[in-house]
Amino acid sequence: MNKKELFDAFDGFSQNLMVTLAEIEAMKKQVQGLVEENTILRLENTKLRERLSQLEHENLAKTSSKQGKDHLEGIYDEGFHICNFFYGQRRENDEECMFCRELLDRK
């Protein structure tokens, strides 16, 4: 191998290294963009999970309250008091009780 061939080989190798370096830099930028996007998505996911948990908790509280109120209304409709003053006693002639009605009409 003479000097010219050796120089040409080094020049070709140098050109290949420059192309490879450019490809690596492009990959590096792409990975950096993906890492940033991943971080943003993780934060958004965390916030959405917190919001979903909050909504589920609120929904559970509303459901529990509604079930309890429905149960009391059923007892009242069967002719029994649900108020603190006469709880469990039968209402005479299914008369309305203002204390029981106040409990049922609360929101």
Curated annotation (Swiss-Prot):
> Looking at the record's lineage, which domain of life comes first?
Bacteria
The cross-references to Pfam families, in alphabetical order and at most eight, read: YabA
Where is this chain's protein located in or outside the cell?
Answer: Cytoplasm, Nucleoid
InterPro entries in the cross-refs: YabA (IPR010377)
Question: Single Gene Ontology BP term?
Answer: DNA replication
Q: How is the cofactor bound?
A: Binds 1 zinc ion per subunit.
Q: Where does Zn(2+) bind?
A: 81, 83, 97, 100
Coarsely, its chief localization is cytoplasm
Q: Which GO terms describe its cellular component?
A: nucleoid
**Complexes and interactors:** Homotetramer. Interacts with both DnaA and DnaN, acting as a bridge between these two proteins.
The UniProt family comment states: Belongs to the YabA family.
**Name of the protein in its database record:** Replication initiation control protein YabA
Q: Which organism is it from?
A: Streptococcus equi subsp. equi (strain 4047)
